[in-house]
Amino acid sequence: MTTRLTRWLTTLDNFEAKMAQLPAVRRYGRLTRATGLVLEATGLQLPLGATCVIERQNGSETHEVESEVVGFNGQRLFLMPLEEVEGVLPGARVYAKNISAEGLQSGKQLPLGPALLGRVLDGSGKPLDGLPSPDTTETGALITPPFNPLQRTPIEHVLDTGVRPINALLTVGRGQRMGLFAGSGVGKSVLLGMMARYTRADVIVVGLIGERGREVKDFIENILGAEGRARSVVIAAPADVSPLLRMQGAAYATRIAEDFRDRGQHVLLIMDSLTRYAMAQREIALAIGEPPATKGYPPSVFAKLPALVERAGNGISGGGSITAFYTVLTEGDDQQDPIADSARAILDGHIVLSRRLAEAGHYPAIDIEASISRAMTALISEQHYARVRTFKQLLSSFQRNRDLVSVGAYAKGSDPMLDKAIALWPQLEGYLQQGIFERADWEASLQGLERIFPTVS
């Protein structure tokens, strides 16, 4: 009897403690309008980014639909749901989520830490791999304050990507932010998988944003592989989820990378794709009434891109780093697409994949002439730079005169540079190609370049 009474009193104490944490009054609003992607509610005063739940009737049961405040007009809140809203009725109750005992809303907290390694999560931190939720007590806010640029460590160390053309001809530094510009079907995902497997980094964070669901599974199981997945965290927000969840997925992947950087680790962040992130913001902005600008993209899109990209890079002196590769989809291989143009301006370099090379069976289909690494000159030696310059000159000379050479219209001796390019062309072309399962480290990449050009002037 005494044991039962003690247990009952303990349960009562726990219940009272939980009750004390609840706000005295739970306020709610009402749903007044649903137009396209946006729901309107009245009766609540909440800040931008606040999380709400909307009651949805399913027969005799009541379910909750999570949403976020994306705008307001007077007393009306504009809500963007994170899931399907079918079945929501006019006048449905809308509650604020994460309300403290004082009646204030706490910010959204998502799981962080080493327990995330090897896991596949969605943009809200929920598992997609069929395993339980990550066993971690570490959480963090989705958005962090801007990094003081004067406290960043300069880009001083070479990052070995394991891909020969990138290592030697487009050298990337640790903490650099690169764009991978490509149309559809030119080997973009395969190249990302090679970098994920072969890059010398402590942790890899992959954000698959707005891609087809089939491609997400294929990338994780076949392209990333067991070797890459063991040291990776994958955040997947495919094309069929809410645009808000797609944007949150990109921000969450970046936040995880920041967390590992703050722990002193060197992180490789792969974001596929930055264009889908911009398209998600376009959907949200147009839905709440923001006027379109260039090619239908509202001005807020071009403000969101640098805000996301600037979070990557080196940390403070002696700390970790985030080297980021963002894929940018070029519609019809148009390099002047507004998102491609904006990304080119805010990134530290770009790697362009060529459809012509891909159709010719040349992989990776990197267009060396159209690509550049802005940090390269500060990372390589004078001899290395001279070899790269000679390589590009010969490559450009051959490409300009390819048709003349092919039909036999070129007379040998007319152009010494072209003569040398023709003689070395098999070696140049072979150097630019690499098998999917072949790893070319930094030292081997330089040695291959030296074999083509033993002496440089």
From Swiss-Prot:
Residue numbers binding ATP: 182-189
Major localization listed first in the record, in broad terms: cytoplasm
Keywords: ATP synthesis, ATP-binding, Bacterial flagellum biogenesis, Bacterial flagellum protein export, Cytoplasm, Hydrogen ion transport, Ion transport, Nucleotide-binding, Protein transport, Translocase, Transport
UniProt xrefs under Pfam families: ATP-synt_ab (PF00006), T3SS_ATPase_C (PF18269)
Biological processes annotated in GO: bacterial-type flagellum assembly; bacterial-type flagellum-dependent cell motility; chemotaxis; protein secretion by the type III secretion system; proton motive force-driven ATP synthesis; proton transmembrane transport
Broad enzyme group: translocase
A cellular component annotation (GO) from this entry: type III protein secretion system complex
Catalyzed reaction equations: ATP + H2O + 4 H(+)(in) = ADP + phosphate + 5 H(+)(out)
An example Gene Ontology molecular-function term: ATP hydrolysis activity
Protein's cellular compartments: Cytoplasm
EC number: 7.1.2.2
Family: Belongs to the ATPase alpha/beta chains family.
Function: Probable catalytic subunit of a protein translocase for flagellum-specific export, or a proton translocase involved in local circuits at the flagellum. May be involved in a specialized protein export pathway that proceeds without signal peptide cleavage.
Full protein name: Flagellum-specific ATP synthase
Gene name of the record: fliI
